[in-house]
Amino acid sequence: MSVRGRIPLGVISFALLSGCASAPTDGSVPSPVPASPTAVNGSFEVGEGRTLHMECSGDGSPTVILEAGDESGVEEWSQVMPEVADLTRTCAYDRAGVGQSDPATGCRGLDDLTGDLDRLLAAADVPGPYVLVAASGGGYIASGFAAEHREEIAGVVFLDVPGPYLDPPPDLVARLTCDASTNIERRDYLAVEHAGWDARAEVGDIPVTVMSVDYGPGASLEAERTNVEVQRGWLVFSPRATQVVMHTGHGIAYEDPQRVIDEIEMVLEATSP
């Protein structure tokens, strides 16, 4: 599958995007320290009597945290995780209600989702610094987590993380409510999307890659341009951020896992002192 060239942050205008914020930072990232080589495959208490399932393998630092797309978990990374674990410690997990993790109750916002990840990393003894690799709706969680833990973020890779719905049709809204029968995460999807988008801010002078899909044959030119252009909003994470335009479907980790592995490896190499 062909890939167009990277688009440097310096040539991108944010005039088309609203709410783009930037926060001051000294650009520092913790010096890598040896991470525990101990493999993890189990469930860990995260409060409220719930457990979340996490798997980690490999050793080294920074640790790669794989954040799956909506209502997906560890299995999304089956073609990516083994090879990335040959490079450094790599962890994936099932969010509440997904896979082997306990369900949550109530309507869940961004703070609930980032809080689960924070508590899970502590319970499983997975220290930073981290490279966050997030697919689709998992990117909003990664955005919120990065905003809360800037000093621990060494790099970011986004896999077709869209901008939030601005005016969704009523039938879609009905499917995205917390109590919808298909909403196994009990996530307030629209609120999480907007909160994750609003959380965008400069994390530091770190390597960031935003992989955006143009949807290829059959998609309207307007749809292609809109998706790619809107996702440039994620480049605010770092002055070193770049965008890669992909000619795949939305599920990049399934359709072109080697490209994902390559991009993660390049980000890891760029974190080296």
What is each model feature region?
Residues L16-G19:
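C-terminal motif of bacterial Sec signal peptides marking the signal peptidase cleavage site
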Residues A21-P24:
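Bacterial signal peptide processing site
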Residues V46-Q100:
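Conserved HGGG/HGGXW glycine-rich cap/lid loop of the alpha/beta-hydrolase fold
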Residues A92-V131:
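Active-site loop/oxyanion-hole signature of alpha/beta-hydrolase fold enzymes
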Residues P127-L166:
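Conserved hydrolase catalytic core segment
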Residues V157-R187, E229:
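Flexible "cap/lid" loop of the alpha/beta hydrolase fold
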Residues P217-H247:
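Conserved loop-alpha-helix segment in the C-terminal half of the alpha/beta-hydrolase fold
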Residues R240-P273:
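Catalytic active-site module of serine/aspartate enzymes centered on a nucleophile-bearing elbow/loop
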